[in-house]
Amino acid sequence: VWSGITTYQRTLQQAELRLKNQARLTAVLMHKELERKASFLSIAARDSAVLEATRKGSQMVETNQLHTLPIDRVETLFQQKRLVPFTSMLPSQLEKLPSLDGFPDLLLTERNGLNLLSSAPPNDAVQRDEAWWETARTRGEWVGSPQLDVSNNRVMIEMAQPVIDPE
């Protein structure tokens, strides 16, 4: 009986050690993947097509004074697509990006936080009141906590990178 208990305890300790090692390896690999994704977002945020799109989008928003309207009014104006109506050139410009790098969803806003383009239907038309958007704008990036995406039963981590126009 003592021998069986000792063997069981040793097996349990070995299993726990293997699990800890796998968790460490997973954490290292996830960190590297997040760094790679952040690097892609940083490069994409400096891409000439992205800069031009956000420049023109901001110009259109400001010319029409959309950035001065209350958020609920903007949401009402753009409730169907939740995107600022923009010229057809925007999606074709962004197709020039080398790849979406495995991101299931990308959202591009102009400098006032109004959506210009989204690869999936966004929940709302204005992002400037969202903590993640403000954090990315002020700190230079934002990485959210892992969450379960119930639509595909996968864990997702949201990331944001501001587009800073050098002009």
Language-model-detected regions and their locations in the chain:
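Juxtamembrane extracytoplasmic/periplasmic/luminal helical "stalk" adjacent to the first N-terminal
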Residues: 2-79, 99-103, 142
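Residue-level detector of solvent-exposed, low-hydrophobicity positions
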Residues: 9-12, 36, 57, 85, ...
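Short, structured helix-loop boundary elements
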Residues: 16, 20, 38, 87, ...
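Short, conserved clusters of charged catalytic residues that mark active-site
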Residues: 25, 36, 89-92, 128
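Second-shell loop/turn segments in exported
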Residues: 78-85, 120-123
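Extracytoplasmic/periplasmic ligand-binding sensor regions of membrane-associated signaling proteins
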Residues: 91, 95-167
